[in-house]
Amino acid sequence: MDKFCVQGPTRLSGEVTISGAKNAALPILFAALLAEEPVEIQNVPKLKDIDTTMKLLGQLGARVERNGSVHVDASDVDVYCAPYELVKTMRASIWALGPLVARFGQGQVSLPGGCAIGARPVDLHISGLEQLGATIKLEEGYVKASVDGRLRGAHIVMDKVSVGATITIMSAATLATGTTIIENAAREPEIVDTANFLITLGAKISGAGTDKITIEGVERLGGGVYRVLPDRIETGTFLVAAAISRGRVVCHATRPDTLDAVLAKLREAGADIAVGDDWISLDMHGQRPKAVTVRTAPHPGFPTDMQAQFSLLNLVADGTGVITETIFENRFMHVPELIRMGAHAEIESNTVICHGVETLSGAQVMATDLRASASLVLAGCIAEGVTVVDRIYHIDRGYDCIEEKLRRMGANIERIRGE
């Protein structure tokens, strides 16, 4: 397995171009299964999960190629099962189920894998599809969906806010008969992006980005060209990199309007922030960040995918900061690794209390999930001495060329190839 070797400490300063959003590109690629004509998807990041998704679409019978953009032609899809071999590494594969049953009347997806972050049940996806008229069975480790004829529009009230299930229901409902209303829908920018992609193909969707989405079913979806929005979590990660190292960064090709909660907390931590239409600059003017209190929440609240990075910020900040995780259980697995580097913290249930220290020390640490692994790499950049981050395949699932971008900010980081 590959690992990163990071020599610190470094004040990270420079300019970074942000890639397309993984959490929008994945559902958009799966939603391309709904289209009877070719689609071109631009600004798709180069990530392990994207490669897996493209391979999966190919196994279903779609023609998929990448030459800058990703081109998907699902007109000849003739396989309706997403097998365990591909699905085992990636939770997002559940997004194949809705488009398959909506367009072809049947679909099977092996129960998915992915990051080890507590319970992420597929129950809400299943319940939503059942309310649209699908019959669902769980057999031999597979979720099997079928419907006679077409799915039927329904008034669906989500039991809890779920990004993944909102996308599944919205995508499937585009080809249902009649009108579907999703109440208590998730509001994340990636849902808006997926809706806009579907609208480009001819879907009739309104209200995406609010807690009530309305979908008027259509007979078919055609082709089109769509550009994926910038990755707000990658943007936030590089902003934190500059903040914890008392440095400066300009993030280009990003969307400041998707990061209001994160920018507010960075300003509270003492960062000097400026924004334009497609850029954000952060300058610490050489000052240590101040500890902040963070509580994760569904959008437009503070994103859970920035929690690990802000845990690190608090652990090197001036003062004591409290972080409460309300979205996922078991999402503080990075904290014991940071304690190995000299951080002071206590975990109490879904809260971590961070006592800021002046410096961290390099150590051998292990990545446990995508965002946790990013925080360990950033910690290595500011720690005294050498940090080795193991199991970085987690990072490759969600960050496009993170070491190259950190090097542009001055980091001394090297990828050591595994056997």
Swiss-Prot record:
UDP-N-acetyl-alpha-D-glucosamine binds at R91, R120, P121, V122, D123, L124, K160, V161, S162, V163, D305, I327. The active site is at C115 (proton donor). GO terms for biological process: cell division; cell wall organization; peptidoglycan biosynthetic process; regulation of cell shape; UDP-N-acetylgalactosamine biosynthetic process. GO terms for cellular component: cytoplasm. InterPro entries: Enolpyruvate_Tfrase_dom, Enolpyruvate_Tfrase_sf, MurA_subfamily, RNA3'P_cycl/enolpyr_Trfase_a/b, UDP_GlcNAc_COvinyl_MurA. GO terms for molecular function: UDP-N-acetylglucosamine 1-carboxyvinyltransferase activity. Cell wall formation. Adds enolpyruvyl to UDP-N-acetylglucosamine. This is UDP-N-acetylglucosamine 1-carboxyvinyltransferase. It comes from Sodalis glossinidius (strain morsitans). The lineage of its organism: Bacteria, Pseudomonadati, Pseudomonadota, Gammaproteobacteria, Enterobacterales.
